[in-house]
């Protein structure tokens, strides 16, 4: 199965982890990298790997961009990764041994790392994602953020062994930029404007849900940062949508 699979990656300025990522998928015969305007050494580093096919194009939102990148692959079986994700040895072996059928899709656990440590709680514990699929029976949806692979009706889901190691956050400045960027994408993608009082309530609940209900407090100071950042993201996406509506109507 491994040799019949194309690894598909979208990237922008992914030099920090691209070599580790590509070494983790070096046994795959094709790695499609779809770049969205990198200005660092991502391309130079990636071209050192003989199985890499390099493409460049505009970022259309995560769902549409990943769907386009998938269309560039030679194989129908797809392993979709982000540029800050690493395939574990156990997962690679699981894919190597896999004899999945076209009407099946692979569910993979993602282990999220925040400033050098795996997060167990805060809603960031090992999250199951469909990342291995046949493009004839499953596709990415059109969501601009928080995109998902959507299997066609009747496709069965198979749990694969191993994990994807996700370097979610390497430094706090990067994290804040990501929160800001995601909130802008959500605000521009038809998010309904809310009254400021409701925005405040949603912001407080986002913190409470992450820190208390999802046990972020057990992740120590990292859990606190994640909880505050989640609340911050909720506040900014709604206030940006609200401001956009007010300016438009003024």
For the regions a language model picked out, list residue spans one by one.
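Short, well-formed alpha-helical segments that are part of the catalytic scaffolds
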Residues: 8-27
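Catalytic phosphate/metal-binding cores of nucleic-acid and nucleotide-processing enzymes, i.e., regions
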Residues: 12, 37, 60
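Cell-envelope/extracellular polymer assembly enzymes that use nucleotide-activated donors
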Residues: 4-6
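Catalytic-site signature of metal-activated, phosphate-bearing donor transferases
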Residues: 64-70, 77, 81, 88-248
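A conserved acidic beta->alpha catalytic loop
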Residues: 15-16, 24, 35-44, 82
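Conserved donor nucleotide-binding strand/loop of the catalytic core
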Residues: 43-72
